[in-house]
């Protein structure tokens, strides 16, 4: 039981940090999110609420709702990161108006961009959900 709570709690903390980081970049640093950033937000923000409730109730059944959202979010993050870093992918135009998806507001150590941070968060959530091993809540 304790391991389940630890993995749920860790997933919730990751989602919460990702959401707060996203809000920091847009509201404090005034970075305008592109279209793909919005899709990643749409998939990450509800995870804070879903995982928060599941954590405090000790409900591991939430895995079946969280995993699809995290996997889709990871794929969007990968596509976004490739568009930023690989010249061949920059021809893909998912962003039709506003801020270009190929723009890089941050580029820490030459490879850490905002989509990369989102990808790490989604991957950590996927790993923690997989470590729940399908245990049922009582």
From Swiss-Prot:
UniProt note: phenotype after gene disruption: Cells partially restore cytochrome c oxidase activity in a CcdA-deficient mutant, possibly because the bacteria can no longer oxidize the two heme-binding thiol groups in apocytochrome c.
Domain of life: Bacteria
Membrane topology: Multi-pass membrane protein
Compartments it resides in: Cell membrane; Membrane raft
Stretches that traverse the bilayer: 5-24, 39-58, 65-82, 110-132
Function: Required for the stabilization, possibly via formation of a disulfide bond, of the obligatory competence protein ComGC. Not normally required for production of the secreted lantibiotic sublancin 168, although it can partially substitute for BdbB when the latter is absent. It may also be required for the stability of other secreted proteins. Not required for sporulation.
Name by which UniProt lists this protein: Disulfide bond formation protein C
Species this protein is from: Bacillus subtilis (strain 168)
């Amino acid at each position: 039981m304790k391991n389940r709570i630890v993995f749920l709690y860790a997933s919730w903390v990751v989602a919460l940090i990702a959401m707060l980081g996203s809000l920091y970049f847009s509201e404090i640093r005034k970075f305008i999110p592109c279209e793909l950033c919005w899709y990643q937000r749409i998939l990450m923000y509800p995870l804070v609420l879903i995982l928060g409730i599941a954590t405090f109730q000790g409900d591991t059944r939430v895995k079946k709702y969280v995993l699809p959202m995290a996997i889709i979010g990871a794929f969007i993050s990968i596509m976004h990161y490739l568009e930023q870093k690989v010249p061949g992918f920059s021809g893909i135009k998912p962003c039709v108006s506003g801020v270009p998806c190929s723009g890089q507001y941050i580029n820490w150590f030459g490879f850490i961009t905002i989509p990369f941070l989102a990808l790490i968060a989604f991957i950590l959530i996927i790993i923690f959900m997989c470590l729940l091993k399908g245990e049922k809540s009582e």
